[in-house]
């Protein structure tokens, strides 16, 4: 979700990967690996990416959080995952 959205926005705005890399303080090959999901996405990338992509930080953070939830619950049945989300919401 997150990485696909970042790539979509980057391409729509004609932003090169090297520009994104500069914004988050990594080299272009590392940025490419991040965008492809080979290297982990870090919290510290959210603010500079949001700025260059002209998007709200909360949208990126929400997508990142959704990806983490999906990753944690991907091996669980839908009912177990839904119950876990319900329990987490009630806390």
Language-model segments: which ranges?
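A short, Lys/Arg-rich alpha-helix, primarily the initiator
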Residues: 1-12
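Alpha-helical residues within the helix-turn-helix
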Residues: 11, 22, 51
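Short alpha-helical DNA-recognition segment
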Residues: 14-33
């Amino acid at each position: 979700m997150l990485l696909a959205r970042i790539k979509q926005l980057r391409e729509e705005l004609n932003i090169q990967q090297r520009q994104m890399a500069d914004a988050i303080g990594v080299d272009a090959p590392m940025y490419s690996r991040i965008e492809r999901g080979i290297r982990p996405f870090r919290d510290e990338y959210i603010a500079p990416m949001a700025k260059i992509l002209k998007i709200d930080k909360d949208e990126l953070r929400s997508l990142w959080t959704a990806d983490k939830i999906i990753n944690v619950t991907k091996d669980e049945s839908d009912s177990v995952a839904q119950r876990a989300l319900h329990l987490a919401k009630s806390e």
